Swiss-Prot record:
Biased composition (Basic residues): 283-294
Any one Gene Ontology molecular-function term assigned to this protein's record: ATPase binding
Signal sequence interval, chain numbering: none
Zinc finger regions, C2H2-type: 165-187
Chain's role: Binds RNA.
Cellular component terms per the entry's GO annotation: fibrillar center; nuclear matrix; nucleolus; nucleus; perichromatin fibrils; pre-snoRNP complex; presynaptic active zone; synapse
Subunit comment: Interacts with FMR1. Interacts with ZNHIT3. Interacts with NOP2, NOP56 and RUVBL1.
Motif (Bipartite nuclear localization signal): 234-250
Pfam families in the record: NUFIP1
Protein name according to UniProt: FMR1-interacting protein NUFIP1
PROSITE patterns in alphabetical order: ZINC_FINGER_C2H2_1, ZINC_FINGER_C2H2_2
Biased segments, Polar residues type: 395-408
Sequence positions bearing Phosphoserine: S329, S331, S333, S394
């Protein structure tokens, strides 16, 4: 048997590549790179030769020696790139492999090569400065967060052009004489005989529509006399202090004569459009008058039977038509009759409300229709309860007690039903009553508005004269009774 070799570094393996291997064109590397990496596994065992198997069994496993003149070996833990992956680390009992075992169980996750990798790229030489612009940057910036050049420039304010020539009728300006002359050559005259207006063709069309179209008022201001007359008319209507005082005096004189009414101004006023009607229904605090009337009626019911005989409140308004108030006022024969109760049906539709308001609207004045005292079923039932709870005056009490028990049972059933209905209404947030639409003026009424005003003023003057002169002698009788 051969003597074992001393425990020294063996000679470096021959790095000259064999012909035909991929490492032919590999450039020479530094020696420290090889020492920083783990050595490759030993080559596979060939078929045993006679006499060699016994010598291998006797020789221990020795590490190869570094080449002469090479640097001392580095620890593998110093260079993190040279460390094997976690799945390639040897188990704790792997140290016995260095003490004489023949086969290693070490398997690397990536193959190790002394030269180039199989794909032709050198290992551990990747460049980290790629000139590619990343796609996750916004388009308004570079990779270095720089704004583009066109955004850095501030927008300059444009200077207003300076015009030296003007056309007053067309309201246009021109920079030189040539453009002004070409524009003046395009002027045309108004096609009307008495009109001397001349301007551009489009402006002449607007002028004809506003001044000479059928139905338009013709204003002639050609002569200085017409201009002076037009100015005087404008000055009369201008609201100076003298004109205001003059108007006040005229109004006082008309009031003394009895001409109180004025011509109704028709058009898109408050209360005429559909949107204002919907706003009144939606906002109960500002415009909803049905609820205020209902609250007043509830207070009247709580007072007792004497409140039922009292007159309904008449809204006091300064601008109410006097003739309309006379028409709506009750006559003496109506006062003698008993007041009838008006009960609203269970299902009140908007069509029914509009029909009721149209029947109640008699006057053609601009005053609002007078509200009729409407009582709900709950209020009528409450009144019935008050009437039944009062002590009876007739001697036949047995008959009344039986009728009272029947009526009380009916009243309790109706009250339970009304409670359910009120709960449903509270949940649905629906108003119990719909406000009727205001009377929209007809075309004939709008055309005859001045004549209607004049006739009513004449009637009011007659009424005023009768009262002032005591035509029927009513004041004399009252004076005589006072003296007696």
């Amino acid at each position: 048997m051969a003597e074992p070799a001393p425990a020294v570094w063996p000679s470096a393996p021959d790095l000259t590549p064999a012909p035909g291997t991929p490492s032919e064109a590999a450039p020479p590397r530094d020696n420290w790179v090889y020492w920083a990496m783990l050595p490759p596994p030993p080559p596979p065992l060939s078929s045993p030769v006679a006499g060699s198997e016994q010598s291998r069994k006797g020789q221990p496993h020795v590490l190869p020696q570094p080449p002469s003149g090479a640097l001392p070996p580095f620890d593998a833990q110093i260079l993190p790139a040279a460390q094997p992956p976690f799945d390639a680390q040897a188990p704790p009992d792997a140290q016995s492999q260095f003490s004489g075992q023949q086969a290693w169980n070490l398997q690397a996750s990536t193959p190790w090569y002394w030269g180039l990798s199989p794909n032709g790229f050198s290992t551990y030489h990747t460049s980290y400065q790629s000139p590619v612009t990343h796609s996750y940057f916004p388009r308004s910036h570079d990779a270095k967060f720089n704004l583009p050049q066109n955004r850095k420039q501030k927008t300059k304010k444009r200077k207003e052009p300076v015009f030296h020539f003007f056309c007053d009728t067309c309201d246009r300006g021109f920079k030189n004489q040539e453009k002004y002359d070409t524009h003046m050559s395009e002027h045309t005259k108004c096609p009307e005989v008495d009109c001397s207006f001349s301007a551009h063709e489009k402006i002449v069309q607007f002028h004809w529509r506003n001044m000479h179209a059928p139905g338009m008022k013709k204003i002639k201001l050609d002569t200085p006399e017409e201009i002076a007359r037009w100015r005087e008319e404008r000055r009369k209507n201008y609201p100076t202090l003298a004109n205001i005082e003059r108007k006040k005096k005229l109004q006082l004189e008309k009031a003394k004569r009895g001409e109180v009414l004025t011509t109704t101004q028709y058009g898109k006023m408050k209360g005429m459009s559909r949107h204002s009607q919907m706003a009144k229904i939606r906002s109960p605090g500002k415009h909803h008058k049905w609820r205020r009337g209902g609250a007043r009626q509830r207070a009247v019911v709580g007072l007792g039977n004497h409140a039922r005989d009292s007159k309904p409140e008449v809204p006091s308004k300064a601008n109410v038509d006097p003739l309309g108030a006379l028409i709506h006022s009750d006559s003496e024969s109506d006062k003698e009759e008993k007041a009838q109760r008006t009960v609203v049906p269970k299902e009140v539709t908007p069509a029914l409300c509009s029909l009721m308001s149209s029947y109640g609207d008699v006057s053609g004045s601009d005053s609002e229709p007078e509200e009729a005292p409407i009582k709900t079923e709950a209020e009528v039932l409450a009144e019935n309860h008050v009437l039944h709870s009062s002590p009876p005056k007739s001697p036949k009490q047995n008959v009344q007690t039986t009728g009272r028990t029947v009526s009380r049972s009916k009243w309790e059933n109706q009250r339970n039903g009304l409670r359910k209905i009120s709960l449903k209404r509270k949940k649905s947030h629906c108003h119990p009553l719909f406000e009727p639409r205001t009377h929209h003026p007809y075309l004939l009424e709008m055309l005859l508005a001045p004549d209607i005003r004049h006739e009513r003023n004449v009637i009011l003057q007659c009424v005023r004269y009768i009262i002032k002169k005591d035509f029927f002698g009513l004041n004399t009788d009252s004076v005589k009774t006072e003296e007696v």
